[in-house]
Amino acid sequence: MIRINSRGLTVSTRRFQTLSKIGSTLKTKEDIRNALNSPVWSLKELISSNEKDMKSVEVSAKTINKVLKLSAFDTNITAEQEKSLVSALSAQMVFIKHLYENDEKSDSVVEENDTHFRLIASDHNPGEPLTLKQLLAQIEELPEKVDPAKGETQGSFNVANMNPRNRPFATIRSKQG
Amino acid sequence: MLRVRIVGRPQKLVPSFCRLVHRASASTSDPWNSLISSRINTNKDTTSAEKNTVTGSSTSCNSSTASTDAASSPAGSLSGTTYIAKDNIVTTHEFSTGASRILSNYRSPFDATVVLLLDAAGSTLLGKSNLDEFGMGSSTTNSHYGTTLNPLYSVEVETGKAHISGGSSGGSAAAVAGKLANFALGTDTGGSVRQPASYCGTVGFKPTYGRISRWGVISYAQTLDTVGIISDDIHTVEKVYHVLDKYDDKDPTSLPDDIRNSLKSKCSEDVNSTSLTVGVPREFVVGDLSQEVKEVWFSVLSQLQDMGHTVKIVSVPSIKQSLSSYYTLATAEAASNLSRYDGVRYGQTTEDLQEKAHDLIVANRTNGFGPEVQRRILLGNYTLSSESGDHYIKATQVREKLVNEFNQVFNLRHVFSNDTNVDKETSGRCDILVAPTAINSAPTLEEYHQQNETNFLNDYVNDILTVPASLAGLPTISIPRGKHGIQIMGQFGADQTVLDVSKKLMEVK
């Protein structure tokens, strides 16, 4: 895991109390059948968003308006649409609450947000840090590394070709009077 | 007008493609001509093309038969083969829509790396397949182009007997099941290759995250999106995988060559394919599994036992939290990725003149995205907002915990692991894990919509069997057993082990 802090990049390994375990060998067909016929939980537990849970999540009209704006969607919605949206956001929050099961504290605000687990090789095994000389050499080499497939050379991406069914330009009318 | 609906019936049902598939596989001696010509016709008519589950490729579909094209393709390990690409994989010769109205007029200025690699290996692209818009869904009903039905069942929608093809790569799986091509490309974010493959009775392989380039794949959730392969022949899947398993410097998430080489030597040393330890994660034994699915699971584990392998029960507790983690990460990443679509530089733009630039963007996005995509963008932005809390960070922590728990279960040390304590004692650990792909076979359209009308989370929780491997980036394949699928999962990077076990299992089917 890569950690970005005031001292720069460091790699650290978070210690978890690991609860996974290797169980017994299923020696016979009967053992296998018994194991598959002994469910340990049900998906209904995840969606049993009972009224109490749903009501504990407060989603105001102001929040709905903010989220619509953040998403660049039309904020002019009907009361019914707003109700549906409140219900969807509440259901999502009840669903997300399962993230905090087995946690000692249920506070959903973390003090540090400089860690971010990803499955990217360089996050876990970063190479040697670059020296200034190497960095400058890389900058020097940039002009030879431009790639038309990435649109990095003049004219390699033609907007008109990308929108063959559209007029090439959008027009915005200035407000009259 | 904002179109937010908790449950959305498809705007239109388009069974024509599936009828064609059904008829082709059932009675027509040479289905290719009719199918290709119909695609050429629809391709000429750009309006009706939008109603088709497969859009034609102008490069490969203008000759009289597909086989002529394939025979003249360049020499390579896939010479003579044909394929179909999910329409969220960009190509220069036709529109790349992601099954969204907002990209219905978008033509990419570059080809995806996977398309270039397949071209170089001699395979011929026949067309692009339908999907849930931007990959968001498990049914291929959330598409601007209509619903793709499952060719294994009746496609008479009126009788209520039509079944969904699964999703989001439902078009790719249906095309393979209908024998339209040797293989199809899909993308798998939380099970979108494996689940439709299972529903349509085909093989669906999601390789390790980072194995196959994502350059040219329209992003949904970039920390999870993986290109996958669907075919009815496991050997074809393996050949295609070997063509695509290449480092790509255009994709920052691509596994570097030194990691690939290290994995190659480790996997060949560590796996003795005649005596494997097979794990059965107890958290996958949910009360919701159908009796048929349990029978299929039992039969595969029994086969493995009869082959001389050891079957063990294992526990990976964080599997129970994986769905909450997945839908936090996926919606947040979707909200970010889809913020680029404004219909100004490219994509569908409104004909109505707007007074402000902002109004233009709002109109384009509100009219351009379907209801499910809008809901996921809103959920993502809400999840990321200060009103709700720091859930994204928490979800990545649960993801990390899940990866560590899988590391404790697998024999093979994780190639990223620098925690030596994790790997002290590996005896008795597993080489592979085996679980069903879906909790039941494909539901009918009616059943599917009824289920989701109650609560949209019903659709989300059905991904419980596929999402854990996505979060951990594990190579996982779904192999068919009738109208069900069984998943074989390996440690991160152990793709070949997964393929080898699958080949053996498919031999003794």
Curated annotation (Swiss-Prot), chain A:
Annotated keywords: ATP-binding, Ligase, Membrane, Mitochondrion, Mitochondrion inner membrane, Nucleotide-binding, Protein biosynthesis, Transit peptide
UniProt-recorded Gene Ontology molecular function terms: ATP binding; glutaminyl-tRNA synthase (glutamine-hydrolyzing) activity
Reaction it catalyzes: L-glutamyl-tRNA(Gln) + L-glutamine + ATP + H2O = L-glutaminyl-tRNA(Gln) + L-glutamate + ADP + phosphate + H(+)
The EC number(s) this enzyme carries: 6.3.5.-
Pfam families for this protein: GatF (PF20977)
Membrane topology, from the record: Peripheral membrane protein
Uppermost EC category: ligase
Subcellular location, record wording: Mitochondrion inner membrane
Region (Disordered): 148-177
UniProt main location, coarse: mitochondrion
Biased composition (Polar residues): 153-164
One GO term describing the cellular component: glutamyl-tRNA(Gln) amidotransferase complex
GO biological process terms, semicolon-separated: glutaminyl-tRNAGln biosynthesis via transamidation; mitochondrial translation
Transit peptide residue numbers: 1-16
Keyword Signal (UniProt): no
Family in the record: Belongs to the GatF family.
HAMAP family membership: GatF
Quaternary data: Subunit of the heterotrimeric GatFAB amidotransferase (AdT) complex, composed of A, B and F subunits.
Function: Allows the formation of correctly charged Gln-tRNA(Gln) through the transamidation of misacylated Glu-tRNA(Gln) in the mitochondria. The reaction takes place in the presence of glutamine and ATP through an activated gamma-phospho-Glu-tRNA(Gln). Required for proper protein synthesis within the mitochondrion.
Name of the featured protein: Glutamyl-tRNA(Gln) amidotransferase subunit F, mitochondrial
Organism expressing this protein natively: Scheffersomyces stipitis (strain ATCC 58785 / CBS 6054 / NBRC 10063 / NRRL Y-11545)
Record lineage: Eukaryota, Fungi, Dikarya, Ascomycota, Saccharomycotina
Gene designation: GTF1
